[in-house]
Curated annotation (Swiss-Prot):
Organism from which the protein derives: Bacillus mycoides (strain KBAB4) (Bacillus weihenstephanensis)
Cited InterPro entries: A-D-PHexomutase_a/b/a-I, A-D-PHexomutase_a/b/a-I/II/III, A-D-PHexomutase_a/b/a-II, A-D-PHexomutase_a/b/a-III, A-D-PHexomutase_C, A-D-PHexomutase_C_sf, A-D-PHexomutase_CS, Alpha-D-phosphohexomutase_SF
Keyword Magnesium assigned: yes
Positions bearing Phosphoserine: S100
Protein name: Phosphoglucosamine mutase
Function: Catalyzes the conversion of glucosamine-6-phosphate to glucosamine-1-phosphate.
Catalysis: reaction(s): alpha-D-glucosamine 1-phosphate = D-glucosamine 6-phosphate
Residues binding Mg(2+), per UniProt: S100, D240, D242, D244
A Gene Ontology biological process term: UDP-N-acetylglucosamine biosynthetic process
Length: 448
C-alpha cells in the first residue's frame, strides 16, 4: 500500500480527505499512466449512489480530459459492471467512484486496466510518484487534441445481459428476496432476477444519495433475514454499496457468508468438472470450518493476505478460477475479473436449481467454527503491530489455544482500525480470547 492507494484504490472522507482537487489530479495522472501509449484513449467512469459521487466524477472527468482522453460516463453502476465494460468496450482504462461497504461520508476511486483487472502495485506507485511531484510536467493538449465526454447509461444493461448468460435455466418457481443497500445494484438486481422469472421481494432499493449501506446491505444481513422469513422466500441476497459483495440468507433466515458461498460453489464446480486445479483461493480470514469442509471433499485451498486484490493475484498466478473472502467478495474468473455480487448470486441460485436442494442444506455441509471479530479504532496501526504488550498477549493466547483454534490480529486496509479475530471450539472460549486482546490494544494504542 502506498501513500494514497490502499488495498482497494484511494479512499477517504469526501471533500475532506478525498477532495475534488485530489480527484482531478488522480484523473489526470492516473489517466496518463494508463493511456500514455495510446492516441485518443477511451476511459469509462461509473459511480455508486453516494451524494459525493457527482462532485468527484466532475473532477475526475476534468482531469482525464486534460490528458486528451475520451471519457464515457456510465452513471450509477456496480464495480464489476465497470470492470466488465472496460474490456468489453475496448477502453484503455475504467474508473469506479465508490467506497464499497463504507458509510456515506466516505468515497473512493479505483482504476481498472484495459484487461478489466485492478491495477498492479507498480502502476499505483507510478501514479503516486506523479501525485507527489511539486510541478506537473505532463503534456497539456489544446484545441482539437483535448478529450471529449459522452454518456453511455445503457452500459448497465449490457453488463446484465452478459452475466445472465452464465446460468443454465431461468429461476421460475423461486421466491428471491433482494437487499441492494440503496447502492449501485438498486436498479440492476431487481431487473436481473425478474427477467429470469423469479418472484422477487426487495428492500434497500430507494437510494437518495444519503442512505447507502445505512442499516442495510451485506454488512447488515439480519435485516434481510427478517424479510425472507416474512415473505417465505427461498433465498435472500444482500449486496453492498458497489455490488462487488454478496451475503446470502437461507430459507430459514440463517445467514450464509462468503466462506459458505465459496464452499457451495467449489463443491458444485468440482462435481461438474469446472474447478480448475481442484483449488479454491481464500484469505487468512476464512473460517477453519471452511478449510475442513474443503478437505472432506478433497478440494485444495490456497491462502492469501486479506484483500480481494491478493486473492486475484494468486488466482492469476496459479491459473485458478474460484476465490474469495468471508466478507462476500466471490471471484469467478471464468466470467469476470473482480468480485461480483450479482454474478455470485446467479451462480448460487443456479446451484439450488440444478441440485434441487434448499440453501440451508447446501450450506449445512460446512460447519463453521465459532468466530468473533472486533474492530478497535486506534491512533496508529503501525505502532499497534509493533507494540510489545500487544505481541505478548497474542503469544499467550496462541499458547493457550494449543492448536485448537486460531487468532488473527491485523490492520484494516482502508480505515484506522485493528481487527482482532479468533476461532475456537465454543463461542464462550472464542469471546474470551478476543476480549483479552482487545483490552490490551485499547489500553496501548486505542483512539478516543
Amino acid at each position: 500500500m502506498g501513500k494514497y492507494f490502499g488495498t482497494d484504490g484511494v479512499r477517504g472522507v469526501a471533500n475532506k480527505e478525498l477532495t475534488p482537487e485530489l480527484a482531478f489530479k488522480i484523473g489526470r495522472f492516473g489517466g496518463y499512466v494508463l493511456t500514455k501509449d495510446t492516441d485518443r484513449p477511451k476511459v469509462i467512469i461509473g459511480r455508486d449512489t453516494r451524494v459525493s459521487g457527482h462532485m468527484l466524477e466532475g473532477a475526475l472527468v476534468a482531469g482525464l480530459l486534460s490528458t486528451g482522453a475520451e471519457v464515457m460516463r456510465l452513471g450509477v453502476i456496480s464495480t464489476p459492471g465497470v470492470a466488465y465494460l472496460t474490456k468489453a468496450l475496448g477502453a484503455q482504462a475504467g474508473v469506479m467512484i465508490s467506497a464499497s461497504h463504507n458509510p456515506v461520508q466516505d468515497n473512493g476511486i479505483k482504476f481498472f486496466g484495459s484487461d478489466g483487472f485492478k491495477l498492479t502495485d507498480e502502476q499505483e506507485a507510478e501514479i503516486e510518484a506523479l501525485l507527489d511531484k511539486e510541478v506537473d510536467e505532463l503534456p497539456r493538449p489544446t484545441g482539437t487534441n483535448l478529450g471529449q465526454v459522452s454518456d453511455y447509461f445503457e452500459g448497465g444493461q449490457k453488463y446484465l445481459q452478459y452475466i445472465k448468460q452464465t446460468v443454465e435455466e431461468d429461476f421460475s418457481g423461486l421466491h428471491i428476496a433482494l437487499d441492494c443497500a440503496h447502492g449501485a445494484t438498486s436498479s440492476l438486481a431487481p431487473y436481473l432476477f425478474a427477467d429470469l422469472e423469479a418472484d422477487i421481494s426487495t428492500m434497500g432499493t430507494s437510494p437518495n444519495g444519503m442512505n447507502i449501506n445505512a442499516g442495510v446491505g451485506s454488512t447488515h444481513p439480519e435485516v434481510l433475514a427478517e424479510l425472507v422469513k416474512e415473505k417465505g422466500a427461498d433465498i435472500g441476497l444482500a449486496f453492498d454499496g458497489d455490488g462487488d459483495r454478496l451475503i446470502a440468507v437461507d430459507e430459514k433466515g440463517n445467514i450464509v457468508d462468503g466462506d459458505q458461498i465459496m464452499f457451495i460453489c467449489a463443491k458444485y464446480m468440482k462435481e461438474t468438472g469446472q474447478l480448475k486445479h481442484n483449488t479454491v483461493v481464500s484469505t487468512v480470514m476464512s473460517n477453519l470450518g471452511f478449510y475442513k469442509a474443503l478437505e472432506a471433499n478433497n478440494i485444495t485451498s490456497d491462502k492469501t493476505a486479506v484483500g480481494d486484490r491478493y486473492v486475484m493475484e494468486e488466482m492469476k498466478r496459479g491459473g485458478y478460477n474460484l476465490g474469495g473472502e468471508q466478507s462476500g467478495h466471490i471471484i469467478l474468473l471464468d466470467y469476470i475479473t473482480t468480485g461480483d455480487g450479482m454474478l455470485s448470486a446467479l451462480q448460487l441460485v443456479n446451484i439450488m436449481k440444478m441440485t434441487k436442494k434448499p440453501l440451508s442444506e447446501l450450506a449445512g455441509e460446512m460447519t463453521k467454527f465459532p468466530q468473533l471479530l472486533v474492530n478497535v479504532r486506534v491512533t496508529d496501526k503501525k505502532l499497534a503491530l509493533e507494540n510489545e504488550k500487544i505481541k505478548e498477549i497474542i503469544r499467550v493466547v496462541e499458547e493457550e489455544m494449543n492448536g485448537d483454534g486460531r487468532i488473527l490480529v491485523r490492520p484494516s486496509g482502508t480505515e484506522p482500525l485493528i481487527r482482532v479475530m479468533a476461532e475456537a471450539p465454543t463461542q464462550e472460549i472464542c469471546d474470551g480470547y478476543v476480549h483479552r486482546i482487545v483490552e490490551v490494544v485499547k489500553a496501548e494504542v486505542g483512539a478516543e
